[in-house]
Design a protein with these regions (language model features):
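N-terminal short leaders/motifs
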Residues: 46-52, 56, 78-79
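Gly/Ser-rich helix-loop-strand patches that form or flank binding pockets
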Residues: 117, 121, 136-147
Length: 150
């Protein structure tokens, strides 16, 4: 089975000059965990994910685990900074190292690319242009249907 058979063709994209707040709203409203970021002429320039947003809003989240008292004492300053961060452009935090898959690739190849690169979505490319997106969940569902009849 090929990527083109199950990819999502109507891709929700986010403009590269969108703010963190706008990107978070788009992801939440559409119940998706990430989206391609596009620049001029709808050119694919990156990917933004919940993980990117989480890291932007909570850059020192590891402090919570190592020293809760220190983290709590910083919370007031952190709240003020969060308001400023909401206005930052996603182009500052998006993943720029694009990992893509060709429209004619097999589902196994797409899944392997995701596993090796630890990503959960891949823009689907035909002749250098994005024509869709495929997620780990898309592949998992299809494989369950085929292999187990679920």
């Amino acid at each position: 089975m090929k990527v083109k058979e199950i990819m999502t063709k109507k891709v929700i994209k986010i403009k590269k000059d969108a703010t963190l707040e706008e990107a978070a709203e788009i992801l939440a409203k559409n119940e998706i965990s990430g989206a391609p970021v596009v620049g001029k002429k709808n050119k694919l320039v990156g990917i933004i994910s919940e993980k990117d947003l989480f890291r932007a809003f909570y850059p020192d989240f590891r402090d919570i685990i190592t020293d809760l008292r220190l983290w709590l004492s910083r919370e007031k300053r952190r709240k003020r900074k969060k308001e400023k961060k909401k206005k930052i452009s996603i182009s500052k935090i998006m993943t720029r190292n694009l990992i893509t898959v060709d429209i004619d690739a097999s589902l196994i190849k797409a899944g392997s690319i995701m596993l090796v690169n630890k990503v959960s979505r891949l823009p689907v490319i035909r002749n250098g242009k994005m024509v869709g997106i495929i997620t780990r969940r898309d592949i998992f569902r299809r494989l369950l249907e085929e292999e187990m009849g679920i």
